[in-house]
Amino acid sequence: KLVERNVAGALNANVAFFRGLSTSEAFDLPEDQMLRDVWSREDEIRADTEDWVFGYMTMAYQPISDEKLQSYVDLSGTEAGKALNRAFFAGFEALFEEVSFEIGAAAARFSIGDEL
């Protein structure tokens, strides 16, 4: 599930970036083209995400004792732990989508400035 949630978040962030680009007339991309472009990269995003998640988990949990790690695993399996994880993802996904949109809009403004 961790990989799936991160892949979905990355795909949504990429769509948000394209939508940000489309705030400029210079990048008038139809929504269906944005979605095709983003979906065409799903396999690449998934592979990158799997690598990232493995590396992140290795680094993040390496200094934790086995006992503390087991406590975290136990918490993650409870309804409260699952709700906490969903809340974290919802917050991060909203933030990444907003930032991606703003970066796309800034890139569009920058490119228009270059054309002038």
Regions found by a protein language model. Give the residues of each.
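Extended amphipathic alpha-helical interaction segments
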Residues: 1-62
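A cross-kingdom marker for long, charged
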Residues: 43-116
